[in-house]
Each structure stands twice: as structure tokens, then as C-alpha cells.
Amino acid sequence: MPDSSSHAFDFTTFLADKEAWSAPNELVPYRCRDDSSLGCRHYPAAGMSGGRSHLILLHGSSADSRYLASLATRLAEAGHHVHTPDLRGHGPAPQRRGDIDHLLQLEEDLEDLILSLELPTDARVIVAGHSAGGGLALRFSAAVCQRKRADISLHGVILLGPYLHHLAPNMRRDSRWAQPRIARMLACALLNRLGIHRLDHIEVLGFNIPPEYRDAHTTDAYSWRLMTGLNPRDYQGDLKALAHHQLPVLALIGEHDEAFHAERLAQCLQPHHPAAQVEVLETIDHLGLATSSITAERITAWLTKQRTDQGGTPG
């Protein structure tokens, strides 16, 4: 259960379990279209030949890819390649912490990452994300479907306690994680409607991060363009796009999620993507979802079923 501290999430349990986490693999640079370099951790599938599934696993707000190491390692041990990038504006040494250059840059970076992997034609790319990373996974996957890119083919989307919208039915109104600067947000939104982006760099969102969880990698605030580029444009429309292109969706959420009402996630997703599989995992909270062995087990079972249903062999 969540602790009773002033923080939004149960960091006490999360940090107490940290010693049991898998060590993260090293960041490996990849080149982006603007000639900048970003980092990604790669977890190769276990076995001599490895599987054909490649999961792009995205971290949540304020964090970087390190806390996903245990989940990535378990999935790799189950025969899936996993790639966990540090999103632009995050990680150990971003060019500008908490900021990006323009609203679509995170999507472009993910396209560049997938292309940099130089995957074989029979590779199965699945985009997954935790929390705000889940929102970006949804946004990016829908954009790829709508653009009909011939060089990027997706085979599924996995949402782990995803952020959808601040007015989505599953959003807890009393969550203390995000600290919006409403006046700045309204000003930027109005200017953007007028085609003006001169203030897109200003900070509009802070995070309630306990001191013991902060380190040199922590990103404690977002600019307007990073916040806007990370969140789904229109989560209902994005889900409809995935359904239209018959892209399968798995959504997992912890029973004790402190940010979202777990029992309401299905009603957010299934009216727009009726085939979306939604599961509530007992005894798990928001942060624990990203480190629990049960999460890896449910993802692995779903990937195996998807592959079998489509007439292939697991992997």
C-alpha cells in the first residue's frame, strides 16, 4: 500500500527494494537526425539465437532508464531484446535538462533509435512505456501508424500504468506528483494556437521528488515543449488509430497505483480500442509496477500469445 508521507508515490518501499534490482547495462550512443547523440541501454535476448521481439521500453517523468533494468533483464532472459533509451532532456548529461527543441522531437528520436538498430525484416518491434513513458508509447505508436512509414513496422503496444490526460477518468485528482504552473501553461497554449512558440522553452511542470531519490540524473521540471511532446495528443484518437491498424495493446496497472484509479483504466481504453487487454495486478503500486517480476511474467505471456495467434513461433 502507498505510504503516508507527503510524496505522491511510495518511494520508501521503492528505494528499500533497490539493492535487489538488476544493474543497468551501459548507455550506448545513437545518432539522431539533428546530428546530436542520445543514449540507450540494450539488453540482448538470452539464448544462442535470441528472439525476434524487440521492445522499446520508455521511462517515466523525471527519471531515466536505470530503474527499468530489472524489468528489461527479466524480459531479455525470457527471450526478448529490450532497448531502454534515456529520453532527450533526461539522463546523466542532457544538452538541456527538461527541454527539447520542438514538440515532435521525442517522436523523431524514437524513430531514429529504431532505425539505428538495423533490425532484420522479420523483427517484431513493440513499443512499451511506464507512466508518462506509456503516454509517449501510445502517442508514438499512433503517429507511426498514421504516417504509414514503410521503414518502421510495429507489432504491439504495452502501457504500464500509463498517463493519458489530466482529465482522463482514471486520473486521481489528489495526486501530488506533478506540480503544474497553470498561468504559464495557459499562456503557452494560447500562444501555440496563434502559431507562436517563443515561450515553449519555459518551465511549466515540476515534480515532487524526495531528496533521497534525487541524484545527478534527476530531471525535476519540464518545459512546455517537453511536457507537450511527451503526452498523448489525443489518447482516444490515438487508441482508435491503433485499433484501425489492428495493433494489439496490453495495459497493466497496479491495484494500489497512487496516480491513477486502477479500476477505471479499462473504461479509458476499451471504448476506443475494444481488443485492448487490460489487467490490474494485485498488491502492486505505481513504482512497483516497473520492477515487479509479475509485470515481466504478464508481458511475456502476452507476447507469446500474440505471436502464436498470428501464426508464428514464440519469440
Model-derived features: positions:
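Alpha/beta-hydrolase
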Residues: M185-A241, L247
